[in-house]
Amino acid sequence: MTTFTKLSDQDAPSISIHPARRLSKINPNIYAGFTEHMGRCIYGGIYDPGNSLSDENGFRKDVLEALKELNIPVVRYPGGNFMATYHWIDGVGPKEKRPARPELAWLGTETNQFGTDEFLKWCEVLGTEPYFCLNFGTGTLDEALAWVEYCNGTKDTYYANLRRKNGREEPYNVKYWALGNETWGPWQVEQMTKEAYAHKAYQWAKALKLLDPSLILILCGQDGTASWDYYTLKQCLLPAHSPLSTSTVPLIDMHSIHLYTSSPSHLPNVTAPLAAERAIEITSSLIDLARIENGVPPDQHRPTICFDEWNVWDPIRAEGSKGAEESYTLSDALAVAVFLNVFVRKSKDLGMACIAQSVNVISPLMTSKDGITKQTTYWPLYLFSKYMRGWTISVHLSCASYEGETSPKWVRGVKDTPWLDVSATLGEDGYVNVAVVNIHEEKDIRSSIDGPSGTVSVFTVTGERVQACNMNGKEEVAVTESTWEAREQFVFPKHSLTLLRWKLA
């Protein structure tokens, strides 16, 4: 949580850090990823058999190494819009017997050479947990139950035995399952009304939890501010009666929301992620309202928010039908850093956040047949995932604000837009970590900082211009390391992310 006092441009900025005020534990899953059968994310991205850079499984070793550096705790799969016509059974068993299918989300052909077992093996190699999305378009409840049985079944049953036949004796124990993806969208195969979706989601959730009560089920929301979100929460945050007792059990564990932002102008681009902060606040209130109206006991699990698609994406610059291969700038990297600051500030309400996507498709990593490129957006992800963990702590910021146009326009009307965007954490290791984005394109900002003492480690992400880019063989944006003596004021460079880190005395 960051409180804010607005100053004039002539007043001296200040930042006060309060490590003793631990506000909420940060769920490591806010640094989750996403891989979809879209463009070159899977084929030619994480899976590239025959390439000299791939291992015996066909997994790109350079991609694995770069993703391991991000400490990704969970990866969502296999979609996305792709999921609405995907049938998991096509992607298991001998590869020569797997059918190729027309793919309707991105108008391609799905060969099914990479499926459930390959993805789960890849997760084990990466050291991450899987998060599966169920087919709410052309899929059936029987198909969904069979997939859970295939992944998690321990008994002598058909799909558990099919998994064993395919070479995996022990269950995978997949915990996270989404009840569809963007089923409200007109681009979806089998678009649904909120009434139809809520009824279907509740009934599926009952059956899934009967099969495996340990599942963590994620409801399909919109952007957190829509009537869809309120209606589905109200209808689905109803406890179900257990068939074996008189008690009731909650069915929904998280509510999913999505947001992509972009603007060709720097300042609207870097302030746009503040829309995510307002969306989290509104969704949190809708969860509470649904629980109150439904009479949910206060000691029963309160669902958290699963922000399972977020990123900077300009669909004109990077068309989805052409693989959505973005070439990210420093401005985009700073927007990603503001997103991450939002997630740290709102950690109390967040159970997960998945950047879309992990490789090649609107991604911090781009592959070629000869290697990988770490885009500008890789570096804020690296710093936050490495250091911004533990507890969110209280910060008070005093500085001037950006007063221009935002995208969306309503952001400036409901959120403060200070020149410095700040979050702070206290790690399990006793270190205080403060992330500060100076969104100003032209002005370094000198600020006093109340909290640190002695020598402070400084990590900086910046470049000569906001349009600096790491593609085409250039590396114009990376992390630099330095130190700062805390008795002095600190100068935050123009258009930069700075992470300050010191041991709490």
From Swiss-Prot:
InterPro entries: Alpha-L-AF_C (IPR010720), Glyco_hydro_b (IPR013780), Glycoside_hydrolase_SF (IPR017853). Glycans are attached at residues 152, 181, 269. Keywords: Carbohydrate metabolism, Glycoprotein, Glycosidase, Hydrolase, Polysaccharide degradation, Secreted, Signal. It is found in: Secreted. It catalyses: Hydrolysis of terminal non-reducing alpha-L-arabinofuranoside residues in alpha-L-arabinosides. SMART domains: Alpha-L-AF_C (SM00813). It comes from the Eukaryota. Its EC number is 3.2.1.55. Pathway: Glycan metabolism; L-arabinan degradation. This is Probable alpha-L-arabinofuranosidase C. It comes from Aspergillus niger (strain ATCC MYA-4892 / CBS 513.88 / FGSC A1513).
